[in-house]
């Protein structure tokens, strides 16, 4: 028998406490469940506390349920890479192509839904931090891993980066990267 449809407002009434920094996500449909056929569906709240750019080998589907968010992306096909901010407003959808470095910036009192396709066995995700010095923009640190539990692994990598100043220091220019944006540093669209 199939489960009932998930009612987002009711789910948020009883479960919003599960949306905790740094990622603020909760997997409502986990890839380990046979019913999901490997898909991951997350409810994600704001504000989040992360500056990483996630690189996923599959496309990611974003639906902004409440408020607006900013999806920071990097186009690596140009030299130097081009940074582009994509606002996703309430009620809007966005499909991010596979292997696109992206940093989802979520603001206070916002809620979105993110769906990821099943990864191929052994597929490697990455989390990358770029230098915040606009004249540099080099990769400060990157961690690659086989993603088996998005709900816990992303948080662990963010915390690993946050807790190690050497990892946060740009080898090219010496600027220390932040693990989360300061209040007001990124303007909500």
UniProtKB/Swiss-Prot annotation:
User: Among the record's GO biological process terms, what is one?
Assistant: anthranilate metabolic process
Give the Pfam families listed for this entry.
3-HAO
GO cellular component terms attached to this protein's record: cytoplasm
NCBIfam families (alphabetical) = anthran_nbaC
Annotated gene? bna1
HAMAP family per UniProt: 3_HAO
| Protein name per the record | 3-hydroxyanthranilate 3,4-dioxygenase
Which residues participate in O2 binding? 50
The UniProt entry, under InterPro entries, shows:
3hydroanth_dOase (IPR010329), RmlC-like_jellyroll (IPR014710), RmlC_Cupin_sf (IPR011051)
Q: Does the keyword Iron apply?
A: yes
Which reaction equations make up its catalytic activity? 3-hydroxyanthranilate + O2 = (2Z,4Z)-2-amino-3-carboxymuconate 6-semialdehyde
- In which family does this protein belong, per the annotation? Belongs to the 3-HAO family.
Q: In which pathway does it act?
A: Cofactor biosynthesis; NAD(+) biosynthesis; quinolinate from L-kynurenine: step 3/3
Primary localisation category:
cytoplasm
Lineage, opening ranks:
Eukaryota, Fungi, Dikarya, Ascomycota, Pezizomycotina
């Amino acid at each position: 028998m199939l489960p009932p449809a998930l009612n987002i407002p009711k789910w948020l009434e009883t479960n919003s406490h599960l949306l905790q920094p740094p990622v603020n996500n909760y997997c409502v449909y986990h890839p380990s469940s046979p019913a999901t056929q490997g898909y991951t569906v997350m409810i994600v709240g704001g504000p989040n506390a992360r500056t990483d750019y996630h690189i996923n080998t599959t496309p990611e589907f974003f639906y902004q349920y409440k408020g607006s968010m900013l999806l920071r992306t990097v186009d690596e096909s140009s030299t130097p890479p081009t940074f582009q901010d994509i606002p996703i407003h309430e009620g809007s959808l966005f499909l991010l192509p596979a292997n696109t470095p992206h940093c989802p910036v979520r603001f206070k009192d916002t809620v979105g839904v993110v769906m990821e396709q099943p990864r191929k066995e052994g597929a490697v995700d990455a989390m990358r931090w770029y230098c915040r010095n606009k004249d540099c923009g080099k990769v400060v640190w990157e961690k690659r891993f086989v993603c088996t539990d998005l709900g816990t692994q992303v948080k662990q990598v963010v915390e690993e980066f946050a807790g190690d100043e050497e990892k946060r220091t740009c080898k090219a220019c010496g600027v220390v990267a932040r693990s989360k944006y300061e209040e007001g540093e990124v303007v909500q669209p």
